[in-house]
């Protein structure tokens, strides 16, 4: 995988930094694992904008990813690695011995021809999935379930991982990248190793149009609006907003905590690190 800084042949190329992976499949994705993906433009069923800064972008198909990894005892072979426009991680097309194909999140170091397996009898190696009760303490894992059988929810993006730091009775304690320590049932499955494509964080799009290709619309500052549109709007000339930063609906922003307490808080052993 190479990180390439483009030559400044035009203003739009001057700041572009690309991550090129020559191992990725250059053809079309496997048609049997594609689903329709329609764009909402950030609107709900009444046509009102409920999520700002969304709209346009290239048409995409959703890739059906196997987050459960529940095909136990059947060895599989990695056919190829592919780009997935729906996530930062790359995905791997795997062929099971019984002829079924599935997409999974590509682990770090995974390549075409590798053998993987799921279940309690699987070998302790990167790419294999098994319950947390069978994973040695201290191991680095990704694609971790929060409820047994629900499918992976933790550590699915490029370069992500969590560490199994303890196992006591019915729960395993995980250390997340954020610094949070959390208990998860030992029957939840996880995949050994880190998620691949860690160089994704080095990428620079270089121009506004590259954001538009991805369906992201501009973000307008509140101080540049009129008073009818934002609490920071209006004033003669340039202003600082005149108050502590708030959202368009008057809720404090920049550090204001909005998370409500949940019954699952009891599983959080230590809160994430403060930035």
From Swiss-Prot:
**InterPro entries, A to Z:** NA-bd_OB-fold, Rib_uL2_dom2, Ribosomal_uL2, Ribosomal_uL2_bac/org-type, Ribosomal_uL2_C, Ribosomal_uL2_CS, Ribosomal_uL2_dom3, Ribosomal_uL2_RNA-bd_dom
PROSITE patterns cross-referenced by the UniProt entry: RIBOSOMAL_L2
- tRNA-binding as a keyword of this entry, yes or no, is no
Molecular function in Gene Ontology: rRNA binding; structural constituent of ribosome; transferase activity
Keyword vocabulary terms for this entry: Ribonucleoprotein, Ribosomal protein, RNA-binding, rRNA-binding
Coiled coil stretches, renumbered: none
Cellular component terms, GO, for this chain's entry?
Answer: large ribosomal subunit
- Give a yes or no for keyword RNA-binding in this entry: yes
Q: Which domain of life is it from?
A: Bacteria
Q: How does it assemble?
A: Part of the 50S ribosomal subunit. Forms a bridge to the 30S subunit in the 70S ribosome.
Q: What does the UniProt function comment say about this protein?
A: One of the primary rRNA binding proteins. Required for association of the 30S and 50S subunits to form the 70S ribosome, for tRNA binding and peptide bond formation. It has been suggested to have peptidyltransferase activity; this is somewhat controversial. Makes several contacts with the 16S rRNA in the 70S ribosome.
Q: What is this protein called?
A: Large ribosomal subunit protein uL2
Tell me which species this is from: Shewanella piezotolerans (strain WP3 / JCM 13877)
